[in-house]
Amino acid sequence: MSNPQPEKVRVVVGDDHPLFREGVVRALSLSGSVNVVGEADDGAAALELIKAHLPDVALLDYRMPGMDGAQVAAAVRSYELPTRVLLISAHDEPAIVYQALQQGAAGFLLKDSTRTEIVKAVLDCAKGRDVVAPSLVGGLAGEIRQRAAPVAPVLSAREREVLNRIACGQSIPAIAAELYVAPSTVKTHVQRLYEKLGVSDRAAAVAEAMRQRLLD
């Protein structure tokens, strides 16, 4: 009794460059593990094929006419379709890769990947693994760190003057007299400082200002 053949991974391929698309389709088909169920030359057509066939993986060019690959990934996620979208591009900018993954892509490859690497990435993606080209990992990590870093609040010149005087322990009337403004104006500046620093009292404001090096 022969063992049953493993089910092939069903794939839709979308790319507006016919020669590249045909080469990828041929490589996937010759792998013996993939069944290409549809081809598209623009994003909207790729999305319709995905909705019609519900493939395991959609291998899409990042830049296509109409909808780009990341927009298709976002649509697939919004429709709650089971297909995992794997993008491929000649562009390696970390911001593009990060945004594409945020929009719902399960992976990102470069077009200089070998056919063997593309086939492996498709199979890995079908197994639920997130796939990113090795040469993109360092840049992507840097992009994530940069976006995760807290952004220092933007303070006006007057807010900085008030903040520095608060740090010196001056009272609101004293600050008002020194800056030639009404105490109510100083109170408004203090409240805005609390909001920008994410605090609710003087001590916390000074501590946060010191942490973020906002004091002169």
Swiss-Prot record:
Which residues in this protein are found as 4-aspartylphosphate?
61
Q: Where in the cell is it found?
A: Cytoplasm
| Residue ranges of the TM segments | none
The alphabetized UniProt keywords are: Cytoplasm, DNA-binding, Phosphoprotein, Transcription, Transcription regulation, Two-component regulatory system
Mind telling me which InterPro entries this protein's record contains?
CheY-like_superfamily, Sig_transdc_resp-reg_C-effctor, Sig_transdc_resp-reg_receiver, Tscrpt_reg_LuxR_C, WalR-like
Q: Which residues bind DNA?
A: 172-191
Q: What does the UniProt record report as the effect of altering residue 61 to N in this chain?
A: Complete loss of phosphorylation
Record carries keyword Metal-binding: no
Which PANTHER family does this entry report, sorted A to Z?
TRANSCRIPTIONAL REGULATORY PROTEIN NARL-RELATED (PTHR43214:SF24), TWO-COMPONENT RESPONSE REGULATOR (PTHR43214)
Q: What does the record note on quaternary structure?
A: Monomer in solution. Interacts with DevR.
Q: What else is known?
A: Was identified as a high-confidence drug target.
Q: What is this protein called?
A: Probable transcriptional regulatory protein NarL
Provide the species name: Mycobacterium tuberculosis (strain ATCC 25618 / H37Rv)
Q: What is the lineage of its organism?
A: Bacteria, Bacillati, Actinomycetota, Actinomycetes, Mycobacteriales
Gene it is expressed from = narL
